[in-house]
């Protein structure tokens, strides 16, 4: 395993937190919090621009995506009064997939050493990368020594065989390369890739919730992130390529109107609330493709029907991901809903009924001293990136090397959870 170290805290490094989403591109420039300050970071500057060139988190127009990143970074640099070189990048593309598996090493009755732990991790990396997918994240769930289970740290203990249950998050290689390339064209060095669902979950949950078991749903414009923690361990981090924009597309198609009008209608009366009293209220809108200003109207009940159909389909896909990850209904105690799309009226109630769990809205945790203007579910992922980068409680290390392009992706397996 390559040499690793925790981020240095005595001389705070300057780092960018970059979230290139379907609807918006956000860049925070941060430094490790000074001694005596609450929270993991001091925010030096913030930049945000509408995204272009992405679809469901995937880069489809390189030049357009690059210009958005450049604009967001420049805005953050002006606010911070410094030039940004290194970024931590959130990833929602590449068909993120969670895998849980076991690795073991024979040690013939002696005490477990660091070298044995490294062998286990190396075996885990080889296993998940065998089909050419890139490893983004890997965390240990628990260790076993022979027949003894539930061991948090086996080092120094004797056994014939040491084994570990691992959870890994992988992604298709090409979409990751394209995302990294966008940042590199903006003269940024990508020092780490973090699964976006994992980051947003860290940003809106407490350690106590993650210990008790929690599911986090991050409803974005083009994707919906799913993360599950059980007993404090990440057990699922996946992305469904469906988000708020798909509701707008459905409204535009179903009502035969423009996408702009569909967005207006969604904001005005989009809901999944059942039993509303005004489902027959007419909603006027402009027809698409007509010569002259022709209008039509639809009942709010029709709007709700279109919205609800898409929301039901999305949650069916989320349920399939949970089943594929072997996460049963009793694994989590509650659901946390976050992301800009999570503010759709009635969505939290629908989620609670669908999963049979209590639900709360997830906002960036105030305890971390986040700027008041950024205390919105839309910035949950960025706050999670801050914890990954600087908070020792997040337990993440990064390689001493800075990787670029394919070199980063070939070596990303070295940047792993410190809980090993």
Language model: regions and residue ranges:
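Glycine-rich phosphate-binding loop of actin/hexokinase-like ATP-binding domains
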Residues: 212-254
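Glycine-rich beta-strand-to-loop/alpha-helix junction loops that act as flexible
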Residues: 89-94, 333-343
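Short glycine/serine/threonine-rich phosphate/pyrophosphate-binding segments
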Residues: 25, 201-202, 212, 221-227, ...
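Short glycine/threonine-rich loop-to-helix capping motif typified by GTGT followed
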Residues: 206-208, 340-354, 375
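Nucleotide/phosphate-binding catalytic cleft detector across ATP-hydrolyzing
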Residues: 1-24, 28-215, 233-235, 244, ...
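Hydrophobic, well-ordered secondary-structure elements that form the walls
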Residues: 318, 337, 385
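A general structural motif
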Residues: 310-319
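Acidic-glycine-rich active-site phosphate/pyrophosphate-binding loop
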Residues: 42, 219-223, 227, 351-366
């Amino acid at each position: 395993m390559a040499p690793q170290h925790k981020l240095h805290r005595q001389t705070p490094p300057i780092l960018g937190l970059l979230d290139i989403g379907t609807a918006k591109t956000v860049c925070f420039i941060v430094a490790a919090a000074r001694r005596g300050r609450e929270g993991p970071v001091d925010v030096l500057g913030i930049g945000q621009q509408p995204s272009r060139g992405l679809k469901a988190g995937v880069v489809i127009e390189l030049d357009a995506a690059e210009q958005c990143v450049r604009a967001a970074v420049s805005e953050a640099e002006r606010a911070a009064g410094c030039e940004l070189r290194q970024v931590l990048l959130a990833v929602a593309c590449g068909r993120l997939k969670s895998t849980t598996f076991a690795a073991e090493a024979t040690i013939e009755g002696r005490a477990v050493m660091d070298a044995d732990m490294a062998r286990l991790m190396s075996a885990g990396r080889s296993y998940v990368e065998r089909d050419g997918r890139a490893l983004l994240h890997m965390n240990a769930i628990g260790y076993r020594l022979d027949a003894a289970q539930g061991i948090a740290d086996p080092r120094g203990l004797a056994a014939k065989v040491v084994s570990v249950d691992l959870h890994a998050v992988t992604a298709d290689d090409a979409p990751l390369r394209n995302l990294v390339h966008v940042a590199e064209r903006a003269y940024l060095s990508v020092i780490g890739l973090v699964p976006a669902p994992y980051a947003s979950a860290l940003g809106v949950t407490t350690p106590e919730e993650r210990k008790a078991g929690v599911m986090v749903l991050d409803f974005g414009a083009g994707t919906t992130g799913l993360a599950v923690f059980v007993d404090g361990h990440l057990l699922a981090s996946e992305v469904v390529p469906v988000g708020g924009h798909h509701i707008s597309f459905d409204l535009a198609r179903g009502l035969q109107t423009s996408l702009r009008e569909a967005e207006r209608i969604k904001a005005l009366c989009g809901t999944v609330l059942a039993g509303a009293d005004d489902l027959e209220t007419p909603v006027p809108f402009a027809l698409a493709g007509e010569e002259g200003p022709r209008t039509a109207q639809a009942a709010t009940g029709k709007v709700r029907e279109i919205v609800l159909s898409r929301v039901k389909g999305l949650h069916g896909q989320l349920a399939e991901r949970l089943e594929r990850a072997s996460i049963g209904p009793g694994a989590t105690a509650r659901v946390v809903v976050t992301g800009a799309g999570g503010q759709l009226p009635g969505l939290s109630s629908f989620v609670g009924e669908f999963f049979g769990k209590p639900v709360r809205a997830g906002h960036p945790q105030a305890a971390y001293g986040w700027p008041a203007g950024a205390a919105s579910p839309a910035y949950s992922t960025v706050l999670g990136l801050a914890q990954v980068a600087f908070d020792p409680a997040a337990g993440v290390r990064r390689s001493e090397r800075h990787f670029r392009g394919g070199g980063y992706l070939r070596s990303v397996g070295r940047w792993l959870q410190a809980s090993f």
